[in-house]
Every structure is written in structure tokens, then in C-alpha cells.
């Protein structure tokens, strides 16, 4: 096997692993939301057979399809993009993860909360840089 064939096989295996991971994640989110596959297909505008193939890891959905599925499941499209390998994961934060995965709030509300949180963390970081001897930010 040539080096090009080995590389192609490795890329193909990685792509199928990603497809399987995103599929199982979508399935778990769907089951957590108590939504049938048919209901999710209907809500997201994706055919039932295609959604089934995605969940089983046989097809890797496009960013548009992931966005539609995310909206139908009321989860962040960013989470699905990262799982699918479309986006690189951003800085780890328990608060950020909690906001993104919360199904009780809308995508718009999630984005507003994330923006506010980012603003506070950047402000606190700037304060720490100005006063490195003070380990905790002040309450202004």
C-alpha cells in the first residue's frame, strides 16, 4: 500500500469516526428530548431515512443540516459543529458548556448569555493583568 493510500485510508477512518460520533450524539440528544426520529426529521426538514443514516454514522451531515437539527433539538449548532469536526473546540468552561447544552432557553438567549459571560471574563482578565498581585477581580 502506498503512502497516499495509507493516508486516504486514515482520513476515511477518521471521517467515519466523526460521522459515528456526531450520529450517536444526535441520537442521545433526541432521546433526551423525548423526540422520535420521525418527529426530529419533520422538525428539521430532513428526511427520515437520511436522519437514520446520520444517527448510525453512515452519513456525515453538512453544516446546514446540522444547524437545522440543532434548531429542532434546541441545542447549540456550535456543539454539533464541534462534534462533527467542522469547528475547533473553543476554550473549556463549565459555565459555557452549561449554557450551550441547556434546553430550557432559546438559541438567542444562549448567545446573549455567552456574550455577557465573555464580557465579564475579558474584563476580569484585563483587571488581573493590570494588578497581577491581586488574584481576584474586584466588584465594581
Swiss-Prot record:
PROSITE patterns: HTH_CROC1 (PS50943). Pfam families: HTH_3 (PF01381). Residues 37-56 bind DNA. The keyword Transmembrane does not apply. GO terms for biological process: regulation of DNA-templated transcription. Transmembrane segments: none annotated. Was identified as a high-confidence drug target. This is Uncharacterized HTH-type transcriptional regulator Rv0474. It comes from Mycobacterium tuberculosis (strain ATCC 25618 / H37Rv).
Amino acid at each position: 500500500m502506498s503512502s497516499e493510500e495509507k493516508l486516504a485510508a486514515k482520513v476515511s477512518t477518521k471521517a467515519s469516526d466523526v460521522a459515528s460520533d456526531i450520529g450517536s450524539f444526535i441520537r442521545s440528544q433526541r432521546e433526551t428530548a423525548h423526540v422520535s426520529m420521525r418527529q426530529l426529521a419533520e422538525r428539521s426538514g430532513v428526511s427520515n431515512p437520511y436522519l437514520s443514516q446520520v444517527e448510525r454514522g453512515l452519513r456525515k451531515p453538512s453544516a446546514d443540516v446540522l444547524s437545522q437539527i440543532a434548531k429542532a433539538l434546541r441545542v447549540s449548532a456550535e456543539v454539533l459543529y464541534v462534534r462533527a469536526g467542522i469547528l475547533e473546540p473553543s476554550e473549556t468552561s463549565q459555565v459555557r458548556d452549561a449554557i450551550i447544552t441547556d434546553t430550557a432557553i432559546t438559541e438567542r438567549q444562549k448567545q446573549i448569555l455567552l456574550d455577557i459571560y465573555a464580557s465579564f471574563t475579558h474584563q476580569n482578565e484585563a483587571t488581573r493583568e493590570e494588578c497581577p498581585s491581586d488574584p481576584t477581580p474586584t466588584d465594581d
